[in-house]
Amino acid sequence: MFAVVRVRGSAGVRRDIADTMEMLRLNRINHAVLVEDTPSYLGMLQKAKDYITWGEVDQETLTAMIRKRGRLIGGDRITDEYINEKTAYGSVDEFAAAVFSGEVKLEEAGIKPVFRLHPPRKGYEGIKKAFNEGGSLGYRGEKINDLLKRMI
């Protein structure tokens, strides 16, 4: 499972790339979504690589994102009581483990699919270069977890 974060804004974006970002639900800077590792999603990520960054999220970071930044439809925070009542899981930690393994999706539990994050502490490395060139854009593998922890 990939975590995808929008790094750059919408000014001057080609129409087809803007449509791809809309399909990924990345409408604003510092918004993050979770996507499966499928060929169709990988193609979308490659198309928008000059405006986003992505990598494999780990379970600890995913749990922290759901607990601190996840919101219910209507804007309320996610609580253990809500998860216990609306799903078959007893706590947010168990639910996050199920999301990580692919057993359940966020939308099935009434949770918004987009995480609105803070800008990263200490800033981005640079929003015009690829990650492997010392910037912030494109694929970054496991290092996405470091970025997400700075943004939660």
Curated annotation (Swiss-Prot):
**What highest taxon heads this organism's lineage?**
Archaea
Q: Has the keyword Ribosomal protein been applied to this entry? A: yes
Keywords carried by this UniProt record:
Ribonucleoprotein, Ribosomal protein
Write out the GO biological process terms: maturation of LSU-rRNA from tricistronic rRNA transcript (SSU-rRNA, 5.8S rRNA, LSU-rRNA); translation
Q: Which GO terms describe its molecular function?
A: RNA binding; structural constituent of ribosome
* N-terminal signal peptide: none
Which cellular component appears as one GO term in the record? cytosolic large ribosomal subunit
Q: Does the keyword Ribosomal protein apply?
A: yes
Listed NCBIfam families: PRK06049.1, uL30_arch
Assembly, in brief, is:
Part of the 50S ribosomal subunit.
Family affiliation: Belongs to the universal ribosomal protein uL30 family.
HAMAP family named among the record's database cross-references: Ribosomal_uL30_A
Full protein name: Large ribosomal subunit protein uL30
Q: Which organism is it from?
A: Methanothermobacter thermautotrophicus (strain ATCC 29096 / DSM 1053 / JCM 10044 / NBRC 100330 / Delta H)
